[in-house]
């Protein structure tokens, strides 16, 4: 985030600098007849990312912008996918993705009043080695797909997700919220990161394509997600 509060002023995020991204990935693809296999690995480092979170501070009783700079992140993982033919257009498909996404620095921050642009506090956000939020870092899929005559196709898939983390409140990971009476255990609990439970969904789809004069394609499809109505997601 380059601007602290783009809707009210033209101030840039303190400590803003060029964000740098370095990465490497490798893939191996194997195809033997209708059998398919793909294996991929990746590693990415991000340096000097900036981020602004806006919220109402109950203690200060004002709407604030929490501007962070110097955020470093690390991403690495492995992905494997395969497709195995079973019989006459029916195939078994599966994929697994495993990754580990972490913050690798303790960024600097400035908390600024939104209305007056007055700096309210500044310091360090202690979240090094915490997990990057909002995306599952482990995911699996297994399903059946069918391609039949007359351009008909159908599929059913079971999806599984795990290692999902809630977005952290960076203010709780600063010295500003600590009290002299707090014990080490209370501080660890305050700064701990919440992890979502694992989740799964079952989905299915069916469709048909029509080719018109070999120049145009008209397709119809129906897809149903979360067939089992799993609400623990």
Task: Show where each model-derived region lies.
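Membrane-embedded beta-barrel scaffold of Gram-negative outer-membrane proteins
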Residues: 15-66, 74-76
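Short loop/turn motifs that connect adjacent beta-strands in outer-membrane beta-barrel proteins
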Residues: 34-36, 87-89, 151, 211-218
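Outer-membrane beta-barrel domain signature
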Residues: 13-17, 67-71, 129-131, 192-195
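Gram-negative outer-membrane beta-barrel transporters
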Residues: 42-45, 62-170
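Solvent-exposed loop segments that connect transmembrane elements
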Residues: 1-12, 53-66, 104-128, 170-189
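Residues on the lipid-exposed face of transmembrane beta-strands in outer-membrane beta-barrel proteins
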Residues: 16, 26-30, 78-84, 94, ...
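Residues that define the transmembrane beta-barrel architecture of outer-membrane proteins
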Residues: 20-24, 31-33, 72-76, 134-140, ...
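C-terminal beta-signal and adjacent terminal beta-strands/loops
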Residues: 46-47, 159-181, 197, 201, ...
């Amino acid at each position: 985030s380059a601007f602290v509060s783009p809707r009210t002023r033209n101030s840039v995020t303190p400590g803003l600098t060029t964000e740098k991204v370095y990465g490497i990935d490798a893939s191996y693809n194997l195809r033997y007849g209708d059998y398919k296999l793909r294996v991929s690995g990746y590693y990415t480092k991000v340096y000097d990312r900036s981020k602004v979170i806006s919220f109402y501070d109950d203690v200060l009783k004002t709407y604030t912008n929490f501007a962070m700079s110097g955020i470093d992140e690390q991403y690495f993982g492995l992905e494997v996918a395969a497709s195995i033919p079973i019989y006459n257009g029916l195939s078994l498909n599966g994929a697994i993705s495993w990754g580990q996404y972490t913050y690798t620095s303790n960024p600097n921050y400035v908390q600024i009043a939104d209305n007056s642009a007055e700096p309210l506090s500044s310091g360090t956000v202690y979240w090094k080695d915490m997990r990057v939020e909002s995306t599952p870092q482990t995911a699996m899929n297994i399903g059946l797909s069918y391609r039949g005559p007359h351009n008909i196709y159908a599929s059913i898939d079971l999806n599984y997700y795990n290692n999902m983390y809630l977005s952290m409140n960076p203010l709780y990971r600063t010295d500003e919220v600590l009290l002299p009476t707090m014990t080490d255990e209370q501080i660890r609990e305050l700064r701990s990161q919440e992890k979502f439970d694992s989740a799964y969904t079952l989905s299915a789809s069916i469709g048909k394509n029509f080719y018109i004069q070999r120049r145009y394609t008209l397709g119809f499809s129906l897809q149903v997600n979360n067939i089992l109505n799993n609400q623990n997601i």
